[in-house]
Protein backbone atom coordinates (compact mmCIF):
# COMPACT_ATOMS: atom_id res chain seq x y z
CA UNK A 1 0.00 0.00 0.00
CA UNK A 2 1.34 3.50 -0.81
CA UNK A 3 2.26 5.80 2.06
CA UNK A 4 0.34 8.92 3.05
CA UNK A 5 2.11 12.15 2.14
CA UNK A 6 0.50 15.22 3.71
CA UNK A 7 1.19 18.69 2.33
CA UNK A 8 0.01 22.05 3.66
CA UNK A 9 -0.83 25.05 1.56
CA UNK A 10 -0.19 28.48 3.05
CA UNK A 11 -3.81 29.31 3.98
CA UNK A 12 -3.99 27.48 7.35
CA UNK A 13 -0.74 25.85 8.43
CA UNK A 14 -1.82 25.53 12.07
CA UNK A 15 -4.73 23.25 11.10
CA UNK A 16 -2.48 21.23 8.77
CA UNK A 17 0.04 20.71 11.58
CA UNK A 18 -2.73 19.59 13.96
CA UNK A 19 -3.95 17.05 11.39
CA UNK A 20 -0.39 15.80 10.83
CA UNK A 21 0.19 15.45 14.59
CA UNK A 22 -3.01 13.40 14.98
CA UNK A 23 -1.92 11.10 12.15
CA UNK A 24 1.60 10.81 13.56
CA UNK A 25 3.07 12.24 10.35
CA UNK A 26 5.49 14.98 9.38
CA UNK A 27 4.16 17.53 6.91
CA UNK A 28 5.68 17.05 3.46
CA UNK A 29 8.34 19.45 2.23
CA UNK A 30 6.92 22.12 -0.04
CA UNK A 31 7.97 25.70 -0.73
CA UNK A 32 5.31 28.16 -1.90
CA UNK A 33 6.23 31.70 -2.85
CA UNK A 34 5.59 34.41 -5.41
CA UNK A 35 7.70 35.24 -8.43
CA UNK A 36 8.55 38.92 -8.94
CA UNK A 37 5.55 39.27 -11.29
CA UNK A 38 3.26 37.83 -8.55
CA UNK A 39 2.77 34.44 -10.22
CA UNK A 40 2.59 31.57 -7.72
CA UNK A 41 5.61 29.29 -7.40
CA UNK A 42 5.35 25.80 -5.87
CA UNK A 43 8.29 23.45 -5.29
CA UNK A 44 7.53 19.94 -3.97
CA UNK A 45 10.61 19.02 -1.93
CA UNK A 46 10.30 15.21 -1.79
CA UNK A 47 9.35 12.27 -3.98
CA UNK A 48 5.63 11.51 -4.25
CA UNK A 49 5.93 8.77 -6.89
CA UNK A 50 3.28 6.12 -6.19
CA UNK A 51 2.20 7.82 -2.94
CA UNK A 52 -1.25 8.72 -1.59
CA UNK A 53 -1.08 12.53 -1.42
CA UNK A 54 -3.32 14.81 0.67
CA UNK A 55 -3.09 18.59 0.29
CA UNK A 56 -4.75 20.73 2.98
CA UNK A 57 -5.77 24.20 1.81
CA UNK A 58 -8.76 26.15 3.11
CA UNK A 59 -10.71 28.70 1.08
CA UNK A 60 -9.98 31.73 3.24
CA UNK A 61 -7.70 34.76 3.48
CA UNK A 62 -6.33 35.61 0.04
CA UNK A 63 -8.84 33.24 -1.53
CA UNK A 64 -7.82 33.55 -5.17
CA UNK A 65 -4.09 33.20 -4.42
CA UNK A 66 -4.74 30.23 -2.15
CA UNK A 67 -6.96 28.54 -4.73
CA UNK A 68 -4.33 28.99 -7.43
CA UNK A 69 -1.68 27.63 -5.07
CA UNK A 70 -3.82 24.55 -4.40
CA UNK A 71 -4.37 23.92 -8.12
CA UNK A 72 -0.64 24.15 -8.84
CA UNK A 73 0.21 21.86 -5.88
CA UNK A 74 -2.32 19.27 -7.10
CA UNK A 75 -0.93 19.40 -10.62
CA UNK A 76 2.69 19.24 -9.44
CA UNK A 77 1.95 16.07 -7.44
CA UNK A 78 -0.08 14.54 -10.28
CA UNK A 79 2.61 14.94 -12.91
CA UNK A 80 5.19 13.67 -10.38
CA UNK A 81 3.38 10.29 -10.60
CA UNK A 82 1.56 10.19 -7.25
CA UNK A 83 -0.98 7.34 -7.16
CA UNK A 84 -3.81 9.55 -5.86
CA UNK A 85 -4.18 13.25 -4.99
CA UNK A 86 -6.85 14.30 -2.49
CA UNK A 87 -7.61 17.99 -1.93
CA UNK A 88 -8.64 18.58 1.69
CA UNK A 89 -10.54 21.89 1.59
CA UNK A 90 -12.08 22.56 5.04
CA UNK A 91 -13.87 25.72 3.82
CA UNK A 92 -14.76 25.39 0.13
CA UNK A 93 -14.15 28.62 -1.86
CA UNK A 94 -16.92 30.22 -3.93
CA UNK A 95 -19.48 27.89 -2.32
CA UNK A 96 -22.08 30.67 -2.09
CA UNK A 97 -22.02 31.10 -5.87
CA UNK A 98 -23.75 27.77 -6.41
CA UNK A 99 -26.72 28.79 -8.56
CA UNK A 100 -27.87 31.33 -11.10
CA UNK A 101 -29.78 33.64 -8.79
CA UNK A 102 -30.00 36.53 -11.27
CA UNK A 103 -29.54 37.18 -14.97
CA UNK A 104 -26.07 36.48 -16.34
CA UNK A 105 -24.77 35.37 -12.92
CA UNK A 106 -21.92 32.83 -12.99
CA UNK A 107 -22.06 29.50 -11.17
CA UNK A 108 -18.55 29.89 -9.79
CA UNK A 109 -18.69 26.85 -7.49
CA UNK A 110 -19.08 24.66 -10.59
CA UNK A 111 -16.12 26.42 -12.21
CA UNK A 112 -13.95 25.74 -9.13
CA UNK A 113 -15.04 22.07 -9.21
CA UNK A 114 -13.98 21.84 -12.87
CA UNK A 115 -10.64 23.51 -12.13
CA UNK A 116 -9.85 21.05 -9.31
CA UNK A 117 -10.65 18.09 -11.57
CA UNK A 118 -8.62 19.43 -14.48
CA UNK A 119 -5.65 20.15 -12.17
CA UNK A 120 -5.60 16.44 -11.34
CA UNK A 121 -7.50 15.98 -8.07
CA UNK A 122 -8.83 12.43 -7.67
CA UNK A 123 -10.88 13.06 -4.52
CA UNK A 124 -12.15 15.99 -2.44
CA UNK A 125 -12.63 16.17 1.33
CA UNK A 126 -14.47 19.25 2.61
CA UNK A 127 -16.69 20.28 5.50
CA UNK A 128 -20.23 21.69 5.72
CA UNK A 129 -20.64 22.82 2.12
CA UNK A 130 -22.89 25.87 1.86
CA UNK A 131 -25.11 23.78 -0.40
CA UNK A 132 -24.62 20.01 -0.35
CA UNK A 133 -25.65 19.85 -4.02
CA UNK A 134 -22.18 21.24 -4.87
CA UNK A 135 -21.02 17.62 -4.57
CA UNK A 136 -22.90 17.04 -7.82
CA UNK A 137 -20.69 19.58 -9.63
CA UNK A 138 -17.82 17.08 -9.47
CA UNK A 139 -17.14 13.97 -11.55
CA UNK A 140 -14.79 12.72 -8.80
CA UNK A 141 -15.71 11.50 -5.27
CA UNK A 142 -16.48 14.21 -2.71
CA UNK A 143 -16.71 13.58 1.04
CA UNK A 144 -18.66 16.41 2.68
CA UNK A 145 -17.94 16.06 6.40
CA UNK A 146 -20.13 17.59 9.10
CA UNK A 147 -19.15 19.68 12.12
CA UNK A 148 -22.44 18.61 13.79
CA UNK A 149 -20.99 15.88 16.08
CA UNK A 150 -18.36 18.34 17.39
CA UNK A 151 -21.05 21.03 17.81
CA UNK A 152 -23.26 18.66 19.82
CA UNK A 153 -20.30 17.79 22.04
CA UNK A 154 -19.53 21.49 22.62
CA UNK A 155 -23.16 22.28 23.52
CA UNK A 156 -23.36 19.45 26.06
CA UNK A 157 -20.02 20.34 27.66
CA UNK A 158 -20.26 24.15 27.72
CA UNK A 159 -23.94 25.15 28.06
CA UNK A 160 -25.15 23.98 31.47
CA UNK A 161 -28.81 24.72 30.61
CA UNK A 162 -28.66 22.88 27.27
CA UNK A 163 -31.72 20.77 28.13
CA UNK A 164 -33.72 24.04 28.22
CA UNK A 165 -32.33 25.34 24.95
CA UNK A 166 -33.93 25.88 21.56
CA UNK A 167 -31.96 25.53 18.33
CA UNK A 168 -32.61 28.40 15.91
CA UNK A 169 -31.83 28.75 12.21
CA UNK A 170 -31.24 32.37 11.12
CA UNK A 171 -32.83 31.57 7.74
CA UNK A 172 -35.19 29.04 6.20
CA UNK A 173 -32.36 27.41 4.24
CA UNK A 174 -30.76 26.12 7.44
CA UNK A 175 -33.90 24.37 8.70
CA UNK A 176 -32.57 20.89 7.93
CA UNK A 177 -29.36 21.59 9.86
CA UNK A 178 -31.10 22.84 13.02
CA UNK A 179 -33.76 20.12 13.05
CA UNK A 180 -31.01 17.50 12.96
CA UNK A 181 -29.22 19.07 15.95
CA UNK A 182 -32.49 19.62 17.84
CA UNK A 183 -33.48 15.97 17.31
CA UNK A 184 -30.11 14.74 18.58
CA UNK A 185 -30.41 16.91 21.71
CA UNK A 186 -34.13 16.13 22.09
CA UNK A 187 -35.06 19.84 22.22
CA UNK A 188 -37.25 22.10 20.08
CA UNK A 189 -36.23 24.27 17.16
CA UNK A 190 -37.25 27.59 15.66
CA UNK A 191 -36.35 29.49 12.54
CA UNK A 192 -36.15 33.08 11.41
CA UNK A 193 -37.47 33.98 7.98
CA UNK A 194 -35.66 36.91 6.44
CA UNK A 195 -36.35 39.01 3.38
CA UNK A 196 -33.15 40.30 1.80
CA UNK A 197 -33.02 43.49 -0.22
CA UNK A 198 -29.48 42.90 -1.52
CA UNK A 199 -26.37 40.92 -0.57
CA UNK A 200 -25.13 41.46 3.01
CA UNK A 201 -28.15 43.63 3.89
CA UNK A 202 -31.00 42.22 5.95
CA UNK A 203 -34.40 43.84 5.72
CA UNK A 204 -37.20 42.16 7.71
CA UNK A 205 -37.11 39.19 10.09
CA UNK A 206 -39.98 36.99 11.25
CA UNK A 207 -39.44 34.48 14.09
CA UNK A 208 -41.30 31.17 13.80
CA UNK A 209 -41.24 29.32 17.14
CA UNK A 210 -41.42 30.04 20.88
CA UNK A 211 -38.11 31.03 22.51
CA UNK A 212 -39.52 32.62 25.69
CA UNK A 213 -37.50 31.75 28.84
CA UNK A 214 -35.12 29.53 26.87
CA UNK A 215 -31.47 29.58 25.89
CA UNK A 216 -31.42 30.25 22.13
CA UNK A 217 -28.62 28.70 20.09
CA UNK A 218 -28.29 30.10 16.57
CA UNK A 219 -26.71 27.56 14.20
CA UNK A 220 -25.51 28.28 10.66
CA UNK A 221 -22.86 27.04 8.25
CA UNK A 222 -21.06 30.37 7.95
CA UNK A 223 -21.05 34.00 9.00
CA UNK A 224 -19.43 36.72 6.90
CA UNK A 225 -20.30 40.28 7.91
CA UNK A 226 -22.51 38.94 10.74
CA UNK A 227 -25.43 41.26 10.00
CA UNK A 228 -27.88 38.35 9.90
CA UNK A 229 -26.86 36.65 13.15
CA UNK A 230 -26.61 39.94 15.08
CA UNK A 231 -30.10 41.00 13.94
CA UNK A 232 -31.31 37.50 14.80
CA UNK A 233 -29.84 37.78 18.32
CA UNK A 234 -31.76 41.02 18.90
CA UNK A 235 -34.93 39.37 17.60
CA UNK A 236 -34.52 36.38 19.94
CA UNK A 237 -33.88 38.52 23.02
CA UNK A 238 -36.88 40.73 22.27
CA UNK A 239 -38.96 37.52 21.95
CA UNK A 240 -37.98 36.49 25.48
CA UNK A 241 -34.86 34.32 25.12
CA UNK A 242 -32.74 34.33 28.30
CA UNK A 243 -29.38 33.93 26.52
CA UNK A 244 -28.21 33.74 22.92
CA UNK A 245 -25.29 31.72 21.54
CA UNK A 246 -24.19 31.46 17.90
CA UNK A 247 -22.47 28.34 16.55
CA UNK A 248 -21.04 28.49 13.02
CA UNK A 249 -18.86 26.11 11.03
CA UNK A 250 -17.02 28.75 9.00
CA UNK A 251 -16.31 32.09 10.71
CA UNK A 252 -15.29 34.38 7.84
CA UNK A 253 -15.82 37.58 9.87
CA UNK A 254 -15.08 40.20 7.22
CA UNK A 255 -15.73 43.95 7.29
CA UNK A 256 -17.72 45.11 10.33
CA UNK A 257 -18.22 41.57 11.70
CA UNK A 258 -16.03 41.85 14.82
CA UNK A 259 -17.49 45.19 15.95
CA UNK A 260 -21.00 43.85 15.37
CA UNK A 261 -20.29 40.76 17.51
CA UNK A 262 -18.75 42.91 20.26
CA UNK A 263 -21.86 45.11 20.31
CA UNK A 264 -24.34 42.21 20.12
CA UNK A 265 -25.76 40.38 23.14
CA UNK A 266 -24.13 37.00 22.50
CA UNK A 267 -22.88 34.89 25.38
CA UNK A 268 -20.42 33.38 22.89
CA UNK A 269 -19.90 33.06 19.15
CA UNK A 270 -18.50 29.59 18.53
CA UNK A 271 -16.76 28.66 15.28
CA UNK A 272 -14.64 25.76 14.07
CA UNK A 273 -11.04 26.19 12.96
CA UNK A 274 -11.71 25.56 9.26
CA UNK A 275 -10.56 29.20 9.01
CA UNK A 276 -7.77 30.68 11.21
CA UNK A 277 -9.28 32.72 14.07
CA UNK A 278 -6.26 33.77 16.15
CA UNK A 279 -6.24 37.41 14.97
CA UNK A 280 -10.02 37.74 15.31
CA UNK A 281 -9.94 36.38 18.87
CA UNK A 282 -7.51 39.13 19.91
CA UNK A 283 -10.19 41.72 19.09
CA UNK A 284 -13.26 39.81 20.30
CA UNK A 285 -13.41 37.89 23.59
CA UNK A 286 -16.75 36.31 22.62
CA UNK A 287 -15.25 34.13 19.87
CA UNK A 288 -14.54 30.53 20.90
CA UNK A 289 -13.11 27.82 18.64
CA UNK A 290 -13.97 24.13 18.22
CA UNK A 291 -11.01 22.13 16.88
CA UNK A 292 -12.09 19.87 14.00
CA UNK A 293 -8.61 18.57 13.12
CA UNK A 294 -9.49 15.13 14.53
CA UNK A 295 -12.41 14.82 12.07
CA UNK A 296 -10.19 15.68 9.09
CA UNK A 297 -7.39 13.40 10.32
CA UNK A 298 -9.75 10.46 10.78
CA UNK A 299 -11.31 11.09 7.34
CA UNK A 300 -7.82 10.99 5.80
CA UNK A 301 -6.92 7.80 7.70
CA UNK A 302 -10.16 6.06 6.68
CA UNK A 303 -9.85 7.17 3.05
CA UNK A 304 -6.26 5.90 2.87
CA UNK A 305 -7.22 2.54 4.38
CA UNK A 306 -10.35 2.15 2.23
CA UNK A 307 -12.72 2.35 5.22
CA UNK A 308 -16.15 3.99 5.45
CA UNK A 309 -16.17 7.71 6.26
CA UNK A 310 -19.90 7.85 7.15
CA UNK A 311 -19.10 6.96 10.80
CA UNK A 312 -17.86 10.57 11.12
CA UNK A 313 -21.31 11.95 10.24
CA UNK A 314 -22.54 11.04 13.72
CA UNK A 315 -19.43 10.56 15.90
CA UNK A 316 -16.47 12.65 17.02
CA UNK A 317 -13.29 10.54 16.74
CA UNK A 318 -11.07 10.44 19.83
Curated annotation (Swiss-Prot):
PROSITE patterns xref list: PRPP_SYNTHASE
Keyword field contains Magnesium: yes
Keyword Cell membrane listed: no
Biological pathway: Metabolic intermediate biosynthesis; 5-phospho-alpha-D-ribose 1-diphosphate biosynthesis; 5-phospho-alpha-D-ribose 1-diphosphate from D-ribose 5-phosphate (route I): step 1/1
Regulation: Activated by magnesium and inorganic phosphate.
Pfam family, any one: Pribosyltran_N
Named cofactor requirement(s): Mg(2+)
Catalyzed reactions: D-ribose 5-phosphate + ATP = 5-phospho-alpha-D-ribose 1-diphosphate + AMP + H(+)
Ranges where the record places region Binding of phosphoribosylpyrophosphate: 212-227
Keywords recorded for this protein, A-Z: ATP-binding, Kinase, Magnesium, Metal-binding, Nucleotide biosynthesis, Nucleotide-binding, Transferase
GO BP field: 5-phosphoribose 1-diphosphate biosynthetic process; AMP biosynthetic process; animal organ regeneration; pentose-phosphate shunt; purine nucleotide biosynthetic process
Role summary: Catalyzes the synthesis of phosphoribosylpyrophosphate (PRPP) that is essential for nucleotide synthesis.
Family stated for the protein in its record: Belongs to the ribose-phosphate pyrophosphokinase family.
Record-linked PANTHER family: RIBOSE-PHOSPHATE DIPHOSPHOKINASE FAMILY MEMBER (PTHR10210), RIBOSE-PHOSPHATE PYROPHOSPHOKINASE 2 (PTHR10210:SF32)
Subunit structure, as described in the record: Homodimer. The active form is probably a hexamer composed of 3 homodimers.
Name of this chain's protein: Ribose-phosphate pyrophosphokinase 2
Amino acid sequence: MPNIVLFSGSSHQDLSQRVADRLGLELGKVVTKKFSNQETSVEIGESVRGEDVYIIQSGCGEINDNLMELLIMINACKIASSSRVTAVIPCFPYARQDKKDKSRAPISAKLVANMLSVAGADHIITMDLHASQIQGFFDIPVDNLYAEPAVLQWIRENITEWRNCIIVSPDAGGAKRVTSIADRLNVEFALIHKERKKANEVDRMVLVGDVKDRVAILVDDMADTCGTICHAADKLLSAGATKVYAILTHGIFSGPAISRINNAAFEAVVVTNTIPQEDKMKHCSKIQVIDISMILAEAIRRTHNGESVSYLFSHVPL
